[in-house]
């Protein structure tokens, strides 16, 4: 899988965001943010960002956060295959320094990847049932 952040790896329409908000299968709270995820049945993850003016006042800070989030996602997307992910920023996130944010996102991606049941666990019982039948 390529490590780019092309258009196909973004949540673009309100419908995509609504699907994740309405029925998240994974939820990882973090410091000053919330990470929501939903299975997407694709061979790549997709990312959506919600950073409002109420949470982070200055556009410079909002843009910095978006750059850091996208870059962290791009670097960790191999472990996030099959998720639609929405990151919701909360008050105070703009005050966190870059190195701390990068480290924090690394931990969040790992927690999200661990929360997904592995495909082997899903297919094993089906395989056992089909061989017995």
Swiss-Prot record:
GO terms for molecular function: 3'-tRNA processing endoribonuclease activity; ribonuclease P activity; tRNA binding. GO terms for biological process: tRNA 5'-leader removal. It is an enzyme of class 3 (hydrolase). It catalyses: Endonucleolytic cleavage of RNA, removing 5'-extranucleotides from tRNA precursor. Residues 114-133 are annotated as: Disordered. Keywords: Endonuclease, Hydrolase, Nuclease, RNA-binding, tRNA processing. Its EC number is 3.1.26.5. One of its GO terms (cellular component) is ribonuclease P complex. InterPro entries: Ribosomal_Su5_D2-typ_SF, Ribsml_uS5_D2-typ_fold_subgr, RNase_P. Transmembrane segments: none annotated. RNaseP catalyzes the removal of the 5'-leader sequence from pre-tRNA to produce the mature 5'-terminus. It can also cleave other RNA substrates such as 4.5S RNA. The protein component plays an auxiliary but essential role in vivo by binding to the 5'-leader sequence and broadening the substrate specificity of the ribozyme. Consists of a catalytic RNA component (M1 or rnpB) and a protein subunit. Belongs to the RnpA family. This is Ribonuclease P protein component. It comes from Pseudomonas syringae pv. tomato (strain ATCC BAA-871 / DC3000). The gene is rnpA.
